[in-house]
A protein has these predicted regions:
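Non-transmembrane, aqueous-exposed alpha-helical and coiled segments at domain scale
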Residues: 1-179
């Protein structure tokens, strides 16, 4: 089966979401393979404007499978908010949206670390969105992040959360002088 890959090379804002939306009627699935909700894509269907941050824009095409892959970092609260907004507007998610169990979660402590790190850098700050994407990828690379599938196993989730909270609270207080 042939594949079409849309890749941006300018750190965002190149129109990947719009291009993906144009290609969507010609494919079986749209897969988001990396990134977080710090980015967004706006798609206009008819006279309706949709702004998506986590969910692939293919979701606006009925019956098209859309996948949030294992390379994506997901803010659960933001994802639920985005899903609810789509459902309110009549977009069907059941059977159309799939989320990898191996996708890592953006937790509140990731956002706190993102903001504390920026504050500590002062004039050298990088201009992060403060949504915790970078720190979530740090945990993914360090193999200590919490994944979507961990939400399905409460004892595992609680164990990972406790370990992460101990480490993140120490990092915030001792390195960043934050709470």
């Amino acid at each position: 089966m042939p594949n079409i890959v849309v890749v941006g090379c300018q750190w965002g804002d190149e129109g990947k979401g719009k291009v993906t939306d144009l290609l969507a009627p010609h494919v079986d699935a749209v897969v988001r393979y990396q990134g977080g909700n710090n980015a967004g894509h706006t798609v206009v269907v008819g006279r309706e404007k949709f702004v998506l941050h986590s969910i692939p824009s293919g979701i606006l095409h009925p019956g098209l499978r859309c996948v949030i892959g294992c390379g994506v970092v997901v803010d659960p609260a933001a994802l639920i908010e985005e899903m609810e907004a789509l459902v309110r507007r009549g977009i069907v998610l059941d059977g159309n949206l799939y989320i990898s169990r191996n996708a890592h979660l953006i937790m509140p402590y990731h956002r706190a670390l993102d903001l504390a790190s920026e504050a500590k850098l002062g004039d050298r700050r990088i201009g992060t969105t403060g949504k915790g994407v970078g720190p979530a990828y740090v945990d993914k690379a360090a193999r200590m992040g919490i994944r979507m599938g961990d939400l399905l196993d409460e004892p595992v989730f609680r164990e990972k959360l406790a370990a992460n909270l101990r480490q993140k609270n120490r990092l915030l207080s001792e390195i960043y002088d934050a709470q």
